[in-house]
Curated annotation (Swiss-Prot):
GO terms for molecular function: ubiquitin protein ligase activity; zinc ion binding. Transmembrane segments: none annotated. It is an enzyme of class 2 (transferase). It is found in: Nucleus; Chromosome. The keyword Transit peptide does not apply. Keywords: Chromosome, Coiled coil, DNA damage, DNA repair, Metal-binding, Nucleus, Transferase, Ubl conjugation pathway, Zinc, Zinc-finger. Belongs to the TRAIP family. The keyword Cell division does not apply. It comes from Caenorhabditis elegans. Residues 96-130, 209-243 form a coiled coil. This is E3 ubiquitin-protein ligase trul-1. The gene is trul-1. Residues 427-442 have a biased composition (Low complexity). Pathway: Protein modification; protein ubiquitination. CDD domains: RING-H2_PA-TM-RING (cd16454).
Amino acid sequence: MTSQPTSSLQGSCSICFEDLKQNDKISAIVCGHIYHHGCISQWIATKRQCPSCRRTVPKNGFVEKLFFDVQRMGGEAEKPPEIDYREEHYKLSTSLKVEQEKLGTLNTENKNLKDTVKSLEKKIIREKDKYRQEIPKLQATINHLTISSEETAYLKRELQESKNRLKTCEFYKILTVHSSEADKQLGEYLKKNGNLDTEKFFQLMKSTNKDLTDKRREAAKEIEQLKMEVQSLKRAAQEDAAIKKTLKKTVLDLRERANVDTPINNKRLRDVLETETPPPAKRKSMGFDESSQMIDPDGELSFFKQNENRTPVTSVPSTSKAVLPFNFDDDEDDEYFKTPKIAEKKKKLPEAMAPVSEDSFDFDIAVPQSIINRIPAKTTAQPAKKYPKIPNLSAKTSSKPTEAPKTENVLKIKSKSQEIAQKPQKSTRISSFFSRTTSSTSNLTEYVILD
C-alpha cells in the first residue's frame, strides 16, 4: 500500500519569517496579507499598519483566524491532528508568568528612571537659576579686573617714567656736584628720546666713586693721626698722674719729717713761733689732713686737740673781717708747716681736759696787721707770762722719720683752773697756732711740732 503525501500551505509570515502551517492560528488583515495571529496582534498593538504594505489597519480590521480546507492528492480530505490543550495551557501560563515578571521589573525600572529624570530636571533648573545669578557677578568681576589691569598697566608706565626721572635726578645731582654748568652738560648725557646715556653715566659714576675713595682714605689717615694723638695724650696723662702721685707721696713724706724730732735751727721759724696765739684761731691745713691733733701714749692731748674738743673753729666769732686761712706762699720754710695727720696713735679724748693757751719764748718778732686782723679779739686781760728760753740745739735729727714724737718733756703749763678760766685773746703773736712738744727724755732739749 502506497503512502499518500500530506497536503501543506505554501507561505510564510513576514513578521517572524516562519512557514505558515495548517494547524497554526493564522490571521488576515484588510489588505489581504496573512500572518501568525500572535505576530500580527503584537504588531497591531504597537503600530496599526500593515508590515508589508504599510496600510492603516482599523481597530477591527483583521480576521483573527482563518481555516483552510486542503485536500490530499487522492482527493480525500486530511484529518486534523489531535491537540493537547492542557499542555498548551500550561506552556502559555508559564510564558505569561515570565512575561509578567519581566513586565513588573521593567515597570519598576521605568519608574526609577522617571524619578531620576525628574530629580535631574529639578537639579538642572536649580543650576540654571544659580548660574543666572552668578552671571552678573562674574560679569562685574570681569569688568573690575579689566579696569584693574588697565590701571596696573598705567601705574607700571608711571613707575618706569618715575624711575627714569629719578635716575635723571640722581645724575643731575652728581653732575651738579662735579660741574657748575650742569644744565649745559645735561644734554651730553641724554639720548634723543630723553633717556639717560648709561655709558657716559657709568663713566661719571666711576669718577665720583674714585673721588669718594680718595676722601675716605684721607679721612682714615686723619683718624689714625687722631688716634695716635689720643694715645700720646693718654700716656701724658698717665705720666702726669704718676708724677702727681710721686709729688703727693713726697709731700706726705715731708710732712711726716716735719713731725719728727727735729730741732728748731731756723731763725725765722723761731721768731714766728715766739709769740702765743689764741686757741680758737687754728689755721686750716694746706690741702691735706691736719697733723697736729695727736695723742701721746700717756693720753695727754695737744694744744689744738684740746681746743677743738672745747670750742670748734667754726664757732669763733669774727669782729671785723672773715677769718681767712693762713698762707705761707711767700715763706721759704713752707715745708715745715705741712705735717700729716697720724691717725693710728689717736685715743679717746678726755672730756674734762682743759686747753693750753700759752707758749713762752725769750724773743719777739713783729707780725703784719693783715695777720693780726685774722686773730679773734681779746676777751679778757692776760696776766704777765714768763717765757722760757730755747737753748741752741746741736743734737742730730732722729734716724726714724716716721716715729711719732714723745710728749714726756712738754713745756710746763698753768694749772687746770687757770686754763679753764682763760679766754681766746687777740695778740700780735703767731706762736699760738702751733703746739710745742719735745722728742726726747732729756730735759735740756726742746722740739716743736708744726700744724
